[in-house]
């Protein structure tokens, strides 16, 4: 075969870099939108985007991974016919799923918008519909490419998709605003960038793939189509169910919160939309740390699986412990930092809508803490799946979902708390999921590090960092305009955290060695 195969660490580094770039572009896309659309427009935007995210996860989370594994196995055996059969059937299956999901969004936008109690979100839903099919096709090609060991088409396609979303989405939104369009059409224009970006990402992936993944003539007898489809579904469905957790909870949250505000507290549809819009400003930042930490956790999971394949449970426990430790070290300062500086950060990012930023600060205070548990959920899900327990994350997700329903009803339905209860219930939900997963790992992975040693130093470091952040912000407010004082405060907190982490040995060479390029990073930090 003439495809280009990268080593695991190099491939993981390429994907991690692409994810970092795409999430940065995503922030540059959504944060300006908040200033342009304010709370009503962002509520319409997220109503469509939350449905899209769930349908996208259901379509693309598991099957491309299953396709990648099957292609990798067949390629290692130099069975070109099997590789082609996997690609063709995987592409057909994903195209069918994408077509169904796109049809639902394009043909039933009014019904979907009504289910979320936001009828003005219908134009955005219709505009976003074709994106599901486009991303499904991209996911099939990317799964095939990754199975051949080449991460470049995936990385390039993701970056192109995010860049197209940023440029076209913001451009359409600005144009419609200048034309005097309503917030519903402006939100539809903004979200049209997602559809355009998906098309651009598919184009880039499709153009790169033939040159980098060419196969010789078929010389083997490919497996039966029914067998390939069964294996795709058997492998992909458990992964899909586990990956759908955050999207499902977010969509459930929106439906429950808006219904409770309208039906229990008696708000009008317009008032409900505005209140939920405030909440989405906090949600935008809440989703950032998990997005950056996800590739870190994912890049460590193959090391766990490889060790278990060798029946080396000690090495598997070390790799699982490193995944959890690095997740905690990254998630705690990110989440707590968002929490203690919620107001200053929001006022920095949303100067055009100061009242909305002020209202959203309360939500971000709790959502920042919740994102710590989201990151733990992602890491622990990966560990449990690597150890052959894919159903346990589903059980913990169901428990968290039940708690979310109960606490939403009790807190959002209380006139004393109202919409403010939504962020608190989100914190409770993800905390329960993370605790259940950690308890399962404690029972099933005896080789893992003790939880006291895992959490003690990061918690202490984060407490000192939070104190430095708040104190630094107060000090810099005397020297700089209040809006800009948060930047040096964040820098001070980051320096304090990193210096103390190295000083007290919170990070070791063994921890970093499991990461892509971790050996070089450990050398630069002079870790032993």
What do the PLM-derived regions correspond to, one by one?
Residues 471-528:
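Membrane-proximal transmembrane or re-entrant/amphipathic helices at the cytosolic face
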Residues 109-128, 273, 339-371:
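Interfacial segments at transmembrane-helix termini and the short loops linking adjacent helices
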Residues 152, 163-203, 207, 391, ...:
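Membrane-interface helix-loop junctions in multi-pass transport and translocation proteins
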Residues 7-65, 102, 131-132, 238-259:
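Signature of the first transmembrane helix
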Residues 1-25, 81, 85, 223-246, ...:
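N-terminal membrane topogenesis motif
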Residues 13-18, 126, 130, 145-173, ...:
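Alpha-helical transmembrane segments of multi-pass membrane transporters/permeases
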Residues 61-76, 282, 290-312:
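Helix-loop junctions and terminal segments of transmembrane helices
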Residues 34-54, 183-188, 230-235, 258-287, ...:
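Interfacial/gating helices of multi-pass transporter permease domains
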């Amino acid at each position: 075969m003439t495809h280009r195969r990268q080593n695991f660490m190099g491939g993981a580094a390429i994907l991690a870099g692409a994810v970092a770039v795409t999430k940065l572009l995503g922030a540059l896309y959504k944060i300006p939108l908040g200033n342009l659309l304010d709370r009503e427009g962002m509520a319409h935007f997220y109503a469509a985007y939350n449905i899209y995210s769930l349908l996208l996860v259901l379509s693309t989370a598991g099957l491309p991974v299953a396709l990648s594994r099957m292609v990798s196995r067949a390629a290692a055996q130099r069975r070109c016919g099997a590789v082609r059969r996997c690609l063709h059937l995987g592409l057909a299956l994903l195209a069918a799923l994408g077509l169904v999901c796109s049809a639902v969004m394009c043909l039933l936008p009014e019904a979907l918008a009504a289910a979320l109690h936001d009828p003005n979100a219908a134009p955005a839903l219709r505009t976003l519909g074709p994106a599901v099919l486009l991303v499904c096709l991209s996911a099939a090609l990317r799964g095939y490419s990754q199975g051949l060991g080449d991460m470049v088409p995936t990385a390039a396609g993701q970056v192109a998709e995010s860049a197209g979303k940023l440029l076209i989405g913001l451009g359409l939104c600005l144009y419609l605003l200048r034309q005097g369009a309503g917030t519903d059409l402006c939100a539809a224009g903004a979200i049209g960038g997602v559809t355009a970006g998906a098309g651009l990402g598919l184009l880039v992936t499709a153009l790169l793939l033939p040159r980098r993944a060419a196969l010789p003539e078929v010389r083997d007898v490919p497996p039966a189509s029914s067998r390939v489809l069964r294996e795709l579904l058997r492998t992909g469905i458990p992964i899909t169910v586990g990956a759908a957790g955050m999207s499902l909870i977010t969509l459930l949250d929106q439906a429950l919160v808006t219904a409770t505000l309208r039906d229990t507290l008696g708000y009008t549809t317009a008032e409900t939309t505005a209140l939920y819009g405030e909440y989405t400003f906090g949600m935008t930042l809440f989703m950032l740390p998990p997005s950056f930490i996800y590739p870190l956790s994912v890049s460590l999971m193959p090391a766990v699986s490889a060790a278990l394949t060798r029946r080396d449970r000690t090495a598997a426990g070390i790799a699982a412990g490193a995944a959890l430790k690095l997740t905690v070290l990254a998630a705690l300062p990110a989440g707590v930092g968002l929490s203690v500086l919620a107001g200053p950060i929001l006022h920095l990012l949303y100067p055009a809508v100061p009242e909305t930023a002020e209202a959203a600060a309360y939500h971000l205070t709790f959502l920042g803490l919740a994102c710590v548990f989201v990151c733990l959920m992602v890491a622990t899900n990966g560990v449990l799946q690597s150890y052959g327990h894919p159903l346990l994350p589903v059980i913990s997700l169901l428990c968290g979902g039940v708690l979310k329903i109960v606490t939403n009803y009790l807190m959002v339905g209380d006139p004393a708390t109202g919409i403010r209860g939504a962020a608190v219930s989100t914190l409770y939900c993800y905390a329960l999921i993370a605790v259940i997963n950690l308890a399962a790992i404690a029972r099933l992975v005896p080789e893992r590090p003790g939880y006291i040693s895992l959490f003690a130093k990061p918690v202490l470091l984060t407490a000192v960092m939070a104190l430095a952040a708040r104190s630094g912000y107060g000090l810099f407010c005397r020297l700089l305009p209040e809006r800009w004082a948060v930047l040096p405060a964040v820098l001070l907190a980051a320096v304090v955290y990193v210096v103390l982490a190295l000083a007290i040995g919170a990070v070791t060479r063994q921890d970093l060695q499991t990461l892509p390029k971790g050996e070089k990073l450990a050398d630069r930090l002079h870790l032993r």
